[in-house]
């Protein structure tokens, strides 16, 4: 589910407290009151449906189809990657992370950032979006394995990264 600018919103069936314009704020407040941190898991990029609908990029004169780069996760093709050479792609991330900050998000895991290709420009874009959000957030990158050749860049731009592939049972 997204808003009119293509920003991700919680599913109100799974998270009833997110109804209306609440977003994750009521849930984050509840979790914070228990002394815990609140985090979300995002797939890299912009939802394909947002691009198909060609929604406006918040705070810009761009449209969604101008900022996608047609890369997608091999295992989940719901999002397109972002063309970080277009400043409107950064504006999209900035808007998404300002929304997350307004809800009180403390931790963000961004999936599909390293395999099969390390997405250096997008990693830098996520870091910058957090810096501009007005709220400190832990940035965790996934999936692994992130090549150790990229270790210095990852360490300079994220707090954590996964170094192995998903573990699946095979009973």
Short names for language-model regions:
Residues 66-71, 83-91, 95, 135-171:
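Glycan-recognition surfaces
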Residues 1-29, 33-112, 116:
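Aromatic-lined carbohydrate-binding/catalytic grooves of carbohydrate-active enzymes
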Residues 53-57, 122-126, 154:
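Short low-complexity, flexible loop/linker segments enriched in glycine and/or proline
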Residues 96-145:
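Extracytoplasmic, non-cytosolic globular domains
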């Amino acid at each position: 589910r997204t808003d009119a600018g293509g920003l991700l919103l919680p599913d109100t069936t799974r998270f009833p407290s997110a109804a209306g314009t609440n977003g994750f704020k009521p849930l984050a407040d509840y979790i914070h009151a228990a002394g815990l941190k609140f985090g979300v898991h995002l797939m890299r990029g912009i939802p394909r449906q947002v691009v198909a609908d060609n929604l406006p990029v918040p705070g810009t004169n761009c449209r969604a189809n101008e900022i996608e780069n047609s890369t997608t996760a091999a295992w989940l093709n719901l999002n397109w990657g972002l063309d970080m050479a277009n400043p409107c792609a950064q504006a999209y991330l900035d808007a998404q992370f300002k929304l997350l900050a307004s809800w009180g998000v403390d931790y963000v895991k961004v999936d599909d950032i390293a395999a099969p290709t390390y997405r250096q420009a997008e990693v830098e874009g996520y870091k910058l979006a957090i810096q501009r959000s007005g709220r400190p957030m832990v940035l965790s990158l996934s999936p692994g394995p992130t090549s150790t050749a990229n270790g210095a860049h990852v360490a300079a731009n994220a707090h954590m990264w996964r170094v192995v592939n998903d573990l699946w049972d095979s009973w």
